[in-house]
Regions:
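Gly/Ser/Thr/Ala-enriched C-terminal appendages of enzymes
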Residues: 322-569
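Cationic, low-complexity basic patches in intrinsically disordered or flexible, solvent-exposed regions
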Residues: 3, 8
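Glycine-rich phosphate/ribose-binding loops and adjacent secondary-structure elements
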Residues: 14-30, 220-407, 412
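Non-catalytic, usually N-terminal nucleic-acid engagement modules in DNA/RNA processing proteins
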Residues: 12-214, 497, 502-541, 550-570
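Charged, low-complexity, helix-prone segments enriched in Lys/Glu/Asp/Gln
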Residues: 193-211, 240, 452-463, 485-491
Length: 570
């Protein structure tokens, strides 16, 4: 069977799976076309899709039962595992790295939970970075008094459960840190009992010491632990580092020291601070090969940062630690879908802004019988000007997503926002969802899952294509200084790490102080005030705060995904 491959699959791997009948003769042949993103990763900084529990439920539960009736699958999808990028043999786009959050997981590993199986029973050789749930503490979602030495039984039980989960599920994980933005949020501070920077530092130290004392240990098959660095400005970030760095020191803790670093707060969105911190780590002997081989940047969604972090990773490998890897994550592919947004193209304009573009998608019950190919329909009907095909969207028709049919109202009835749910107004009732309800949307829960998978592929390929283009000589505007010597970012980073001593390296960083102000960080920060301004990702900034450059993914509301998950039938 010969397939006509779309443009993006020209470099795909094709596996031939031959099914034999009982007599041994060939009964049929199926070609599984895989876009092997693991093979395309090369030496780039590693993007980790932050797996949504909503999405993982489809993969996991289908292993035990027909959670989705196979008759609901679009033509070409024969196995839910095709949507599981952690499955190297069956996935449409194998990719072996991901992030899973303990904050959203069922932490009780003593009982089978098929909705968790995508992560719990993943293929050997795949990589999971476990997030510990500090965000849930700060938001008050994990109830309890989280202050150091509070004696709170609820908080202690959660510490025990999350460490056990991380030790048994992840390859690397984050410490149970308290994000410093909590001290600027009165509601959050009240929920967790932490309202000052010293209290956040003390609570994190308490959690660090618990993790250090009770971790399984790498030699015993346990997870490696990343020391999370917080701070909402340069001063507090420096204070946090000086306080917490000892936990990664093998001289002080030869058997239980932490195994790398995670950049949170201002550390993960401020290039000046990132470079200064790496120089400090180098000269504090805390980037040792085989000891501190991993650094993760939390919640990093800017496409240009995929290239920026690759440049930094390569410099550290060249001059400090050949085994060093930088990873970064975001949940944008899942959040976007929950907000009705779908990635439709990635944009790479030399010496300009690089970005993934997302927009409101087709959601109309008139499409419930529309057999047009999805990409054809959304462009023809003006929903998108362009559509970049993914291995998932390539299978879809309009009716595969817009699954619910509209009802037929009685003659003379005008449906409104107030009355459209009244069954007495219909001759033929609208389709109902799994919960026996009907609403305005034409999507069922599997529609969301399919488009989430598409969005993940779009995000992953955007990151890889950005690095490929950069290596070929193209660059986003922020990777070159716009004034003065017009220095390229990679040349400056090379000079910093090639410097003969710490002072020289720090002087080079200081020399380019105005350039660092040009680089837009995660959550849109840009400008000199980032050195002192607070960093809270849950607020919408005004220009009274640091200048910002926001993108669609900055405005996605996490509540939409939480609502979707809460309505999901487990």
């Amino acid at each position: 069977m010969q397939l006509d491959l779309p443009q993006h699959c020209m470099s795909c791997l094709v596996l031939i799976i031959t099914y034999m009948n009982e007599s041994g003769s060939k009964s049929s042949g199926v070609e599984l076309t895989q876009d092997n993103l693991t093979a395309k990763q090369l030496d780039y900084a590693v993007f980790l899709p932050a797996i949504s529990g909503f999405y993982a439920t489809f993969v996991g539960k289908q292993r035990n039962e027909p959670y989705v009736d196979p008759a609901r699958f679009p033509q070409g999808l024969t196995d839910m595992e095709q949507l599981n990028w952690l499955n190297s043999t069956k996935a449409l786009f194998p990719y072996r790295w991901s992030l899973a959050s303990g904050g959203h997981a069922n932490l009780d590993l003593s009982k089978q939970d098929w909705s968790e199986d995508m992560v719990r029973n993943r293929e050997p050789g795949t990589f999971i970075l476990g997030d510990s749930g500090g965000f849930q503490i700060a938001k008050g979602l994990w109830e309890g008094d989280w202050r150091a030495n509070s004696g709170c039984a609820k908080a202690q039980k959660k510490r025990e459960l999350v460490l056990n989960w991380l030790d048994n599920v992840s390859d690397y994980c984050m410490t149970l840190d308290i994000p410093t933005w909590v001290i600027h949020d009165k509601k959050a501070a009240k929920a967790c009992g932490i309202s000052t920077l010293p209290a956040a530092v003390a609570a994190t130290k308490f959690n660090n010491e618990y993790f250090m004392k009770h971790r399984k240990g790498v030699r015993n098959g346990g997870t490696k632990i990343l020391n999370v660095l917080q701070g909402d400005n340069h001063g507090s970030a420096d204070q946090w580092y000086e306080t917490m760095k000892e936990y990664c020191d093998p001289a002080k803790y030869p058997d239980t020291h932490f195994d790398g670093w995670a950049m949170g707060g201002q550390n993960m969105c401020d290039v000046d601070l990132v470079l200064r911190r790496l120089v400090a780590l180098r000269y504090d002997n805390l980037l040792q090969e085989g000891v501190h081989d991993w650094m993760h940047f939390l919640g990093t969604s800017k496409l240009e940062w995929a290239v920026l972090l690759t440049v930094i990773q390569r410099a550290v490998r060249k001059y400090v630690n050949p085994a060093f890897t930088i990873s970064f994550d975001c949940a944008s592919p899942f959040l976007a879908t929950a907000n009705g947004q779908v990635y439709y193209e990635n944009v790479f304009k030399h010496d300009s802004k690089w970005s993934y573009r997302m927009g409101p998608s087709a959601d109309d019950k008139k499409y419930a019988t529309d057999t047009r190919k999805w990409s054809t329909g959304v462009v023809a009907d003006g929903i998108y000007n362009n559509w970049q095909e993914s291995p998932i969207s390539d299978m879809l028709t309009m009716k595969d997503i817009c699954i619910y049919k509209a009802g037929t109202p009685k003659t003379g009835v005008v449906l409104t926002e107030e009355n459209f749910r009244d069954p007495a107004l219909y001759d033929v009732l609208p389709d109902v969802n799994k919960n026996g309800k009907w609403g305005k949307t034409s999507w069922d829960s599997f529609s969301y899952a399919l488009l989430m998978g598409h969005n993940v592929w779009m995000h992953l390929t955007a990151v890889q294509e950005a690095n490929q283009r950069f290596d070929a000589g193209e660059r986003p505007a922020m990777m070159q200084r716009s004034t003065g010597d017009y220095a390229k970012f990679e040349d400056i980073v090379e000079a910093i790490f090639a410097a003969p001593d710490r002072q020289t390296a720090e002087d080079i960083i200081k020399l380019y102080d105005t350039y660092w102000m040009e680089i837009v960080g995660t959550r849109g920060f840009k400008g000199k005030k980032t050195k002192n301004a607070r960093s809270q990702f849950h607020v919408l900034y005004t220009f009274d705060e640091p200048e910002v450059d926001t993108e669609p993914e900055d405005q996605l509301q996490s509540e939409a995904l939480q609502l979707l998950e809460s309505e999901q039938i487990k």
